């Protein structure tokens, strides 16, 4: 099974944690690390300590909020430093639909990169803009989005 570690600015990670628990229940393979404004080095220590608790997994997919942000950069540093001991992949642009898909599919994939690659179309498809269709007043069905 793939382990998941979520990190982002402010309470991004714990906010997603509460939403994920509400939608999918407790996910034992998923850990959350917030970046509350401490130094980048302190965040790196927190992420490293969390990764240390996840060594039983086949690999770890780290899900962060912003590409190039401190949680992303420190996770990439740890990926490179631990390449010989732990398989770690790092992904940015995380949102709730992506996390939900990762959590429900983490047991299907053997490598975190395979899970990450499978999630890219899911992430893109989760972004939608509501458009009111005109010309069909009899159709009051708003689909699954309302």
Language-model-detected regions and their locations in the chain:
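N-terminal loops that bind phosphate or other acidic moieties
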Residues: 1-146
């Amino acid at each position: 099974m793939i382990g998941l570690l979520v990190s982002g600015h402010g309470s991004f990670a714990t906010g997603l944690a509460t939403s994920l628990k509400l939608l999918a229940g407790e996910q034992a393979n998923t850990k959350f690390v917030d970046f509350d404004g401490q130094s980048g080095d302190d965040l790196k220590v927190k992420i490293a300590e969390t990764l240390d608790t996840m060594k039983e997994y086949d690999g770890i997919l780290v899900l962060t909020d912003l590409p190039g942000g401190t949680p992303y950069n420190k996770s990439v540093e740890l990926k490179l430093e631990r390449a010989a001991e732990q398989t770690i992949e790092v992904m940015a642009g995380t949102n709730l639909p992506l996390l939900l898909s990762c959590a429900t599919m983490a047991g299907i994939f053997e490598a975190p990169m395979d899970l990450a690659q499978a999630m890219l179309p899911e992430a893109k498809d989760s972004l939608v803009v509501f458009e009111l269709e005109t010309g069909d007043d009899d159709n009051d069905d708003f689909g699954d989005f309302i």
